[in-house]
Structure formats: structure tokens, C-alpha cells
């Protein structure tokens, strides 16, 4: 019998926003964060996205910053009409929290356990050898989680 797997660390929080520039200014007003940690960009073109079993285009702009040792990422989807996880979240709930970036004790065992229980990722992102899986537990827990095999961002420096 497989041992119960635990999330070892939450190292990132992803929020979806309508307007990245406006949301950035709101965050700058609300909280103090290291302005030297700010990184902006666009989703990579070479990433394959499989959302709810279907390959999709998922383009977005983002801003990352370090807040108390945790990476916060604000995402503005380019497509606002639905069909990808970020625009669907905006349509359903409006701007706000989307998912946690987590580092489990044993990612492969946890994925295997989810698979045995019939739990499939809602989003698979493949970029070269990197594969990120986002599981949608919103109905049960109110959140989605992205399982990572390493810690990135400010937590990786600790």
C-alpha cells in the first residue's frame, strides 16, 4: 500500500487578473515587496498545453515578484473568451487566486496515487523535458495545485 504523500512546501501563488498593469499597481499599493525581484514576460511559444484532455493555445502575460520568500505570479490571459484555464477562471470567478505551486515529498508517487484514484490533471504543460501538472481540487478544497519536482523562485534560495 502506498504511503500518504504530503505537500512539503508551497513556494508559489498564481493569481489570474483582467489587466496586468492595473493589477500590478494594486499589488504595489497593497503590499510591500522587493521591487528588484519583479520579472515580467509572456508565456513561452514552445510550450504544449493540454487542458481537460484537449491540446490548446494558452498565451498570457505575467509578472512575478517575491513576497515574503514566496513567488507571486500575476497572469493576464491574452484570450479572454474561454477555453484555457486562466480565461475560464476569469469567466467563472473573476480575478483572483488560481493555483498554488507546490513541492511534494515524492512527486512521482503522488502522481501515481492520483492516477490510481482516477484523478487526472486538468492542465499539462510540456516544455522540452519539463512537465508541469495542475490538478483541480476546487470543488473539494477551493484550490488547484501545480506539482513541481523542484522548488524555484525565492524559496529555492533559502
Give the residues covered by each predicted segment.
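Vicinal oxygen chelate
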Residues: 1-6, 10-18, 62-71, 73-76, 87-106, 136, ...
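N-terminal beta-strand motif that seeds the catalytic metal site of vicinal oxygen chelate
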Residues: 1-24, 31-33, 95-102, 158
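Short consensus segments that form the blades of beta-propeller domains
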Residues: 3-4, 53, 90-91
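A short secondary-structure junction signal
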Residues: 26, 86, 112-113
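Conserved short beta-strand elements that form part of the metal-binding/catalytic scaffold
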Residues: 34-88, 131-154
Amino acid at each position: 500500500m502506498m504511503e500518504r504523500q504530503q505537500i512539503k512546501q508551497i513556494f508559489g501563488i498564481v493569481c489570474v487578473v483582467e489587466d496586468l498593469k492595473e493589477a500590478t499597481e494594486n499589488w504595489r499599493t497593497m503590499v510591500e515587496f522587493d521591487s528588484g525581484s519583479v520579472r515580467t514576460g509572456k508565456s513561452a511559444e514552445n510550450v504544449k498545453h493540454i487542458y481537460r484532455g484537449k491540446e490548446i493555445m494558452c498565451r498570457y502575460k505575467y509578472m512575478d515578484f517575491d513576497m515574503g520568500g514566496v513567488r507571486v505570479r500575476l497572469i493576464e490571459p491574452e484570450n479572454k473568451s474561454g477555453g484555457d484555464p486562466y480565461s475560464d477562471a476569469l469567466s467563472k470567478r473573476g480575478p483572483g487566486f488560481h493555483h498554488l505551486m507546490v513541492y511534494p515529498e515524492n512527486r512521482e508517487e503522488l502522481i501515481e496515487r492520483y492516477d490510481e484514484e482516477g484523478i487526472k490533471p486538468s492542465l499539462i504543460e510540456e516544455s522540452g523535458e519539463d512537465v508541469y501538472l495542475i490538478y483541480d481540487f476546487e470543488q473539494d478544497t477551493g484550490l488547484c495545485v501545480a506539482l513541481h519536482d523542484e522548488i524555484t523562485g525565492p524559496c529555492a534560495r533559502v
